[in-house]
Amino acid sequence: LPYFAFIMYAINRGTGFTRALFMNCDHSLLTYSFYKKPDMVLKLFRIRLREIMKINLPPALVIGAGLGVLLYASGGTDNPLNYVVLFVSILCMSMFFSVHYLTVYYLLQPYSVDAQVKSGTYQLVMSVTYFVCFYLMRVRMPTLVFGVMCIAFCVLYFIAACILIYRFAPKTFRLRG
């Protein structure tokens, strides 16, 4: 299961989605003050999260269901809870990366007016994300343990992301020169 953190990272459409948001929406609207009010920022974040999850969810559903079928076909497991945890943890990984890309976009807004990445902090965060996912491929632990930890982490990350966006994005979500 830890391998799939890297796979879910690799298939996530977060970078393209946030770049499209910037070029088609935020580039023009960030000049207006109403667009930076905390309630508005959080509302837009939730709407956009729903939309990016619609993009990232189908592959996660296929992978999660496919893993369950493969587990069953290969002899299964003694604990039927493993099937549920396997499926839900794949969906949570997809949710995590959707939330992560949007959160980093809102908190660091990495794009310049011409849609080029100008934030060194953004590049650092994305590099750390890559290396953590890569490192997870070396982790060896039972599916149930890793899956439950993954699900709990994803839920906590979502809550923390909403709080951070509400508090900080109105100040950090701006046009770069």
Which stretches of residues belong to each language-model region?
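Glycine-rich nucleotide cofactor-binding loops and adjacent beta-alpha elements
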Residues: 36
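Hydrophobic alpha-helical transmembrane segments of membrane proteins
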Residues: 1-31, 39-177
